[in-house]
């Protein structure tokens, strides 16, 4: 059953573009995801962390997407973010409880996690991912998933994957999952069509 009070729209903003933070928070999106991962180049990772630590943010509406736990930037993210009142962390390429437990431990078991399902391994690990008490809900990352699977990125190619994410979330008693981003975000008709498709499948929110 849908939670009418749950966030529906999630807006990405690169961590190294602090001039966009306030605009994103004023955009009307329910949540703003400040991204330290794919949206920030390797040479700008430190600048991105510095921008987040120095920003005046409404942490009740901000989610931080950290770098993959296997990357060299993960520990630097933890070091920078641990002293901030971050409430929710998005975990890319989450592939099981070991990965998530590492994040939970690094942040002293005091944050809510949103794991991203971005490869086949993470799809088949959904039962253990969703059973973790610190997991709020999961989010789909269709571009990385299609790359891992070797499939197309269109609705038809990944409908079966989306359905599995929705079904497993319902079975685990978790809130409806968050669907992936619309690549051409400047096309409002495409974004609306994507959102309608996501809703039809049972997703409760979408990344913009």
Predicted regions and their residues:
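Expand to "…catalyze enediolate/carbanion chemistry for C-C bond making/breaking, isomerization
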Residues: 1-208
């Amino acid at each position: 059953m849908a939670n009418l009070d749950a966030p529906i729209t999630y807006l990405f903003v690169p961590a190294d573009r602090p001039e966009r933070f306030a605009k994103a928070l004023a955009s009307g999106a329910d949540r703003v995801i400040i991204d330290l991962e794919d949206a920030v180049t390797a040479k700008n990772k430190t600048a991105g962390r510095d921008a987040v630590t120095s920003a005046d943010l409404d942490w009740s509406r901000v989610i931080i997407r950290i770098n993959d736990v296997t990357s060299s930037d993960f520990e630097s993210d933890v070091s920078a973010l641990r002293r901030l009142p971050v409430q929710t962390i998005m975990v890319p390429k989450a592939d099981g409880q070991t990965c998530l437990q590492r994040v939970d431990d690094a942040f002293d078991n005091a944050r809510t996690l949103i794991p991203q399902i971005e490869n086949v391994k993470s799809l088949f690990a959904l039962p253990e991912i969703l059973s973790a008490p610190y997991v709020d809900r999961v989010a789909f990352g269709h571009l990385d998933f299609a790359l891992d699977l070797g499939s197309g990125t269109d609705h038809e190619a990944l409908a079966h994957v989306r359905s599995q994410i929705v079904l497993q979330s319902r079975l685990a008693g978790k809130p409806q999952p968050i669907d992936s981003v619309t690549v051409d975000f400047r096309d409002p008709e495409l974004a609306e069509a994507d959102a309608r498709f996501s809703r039809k499948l049972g997703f409760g929110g979408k990344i913009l």
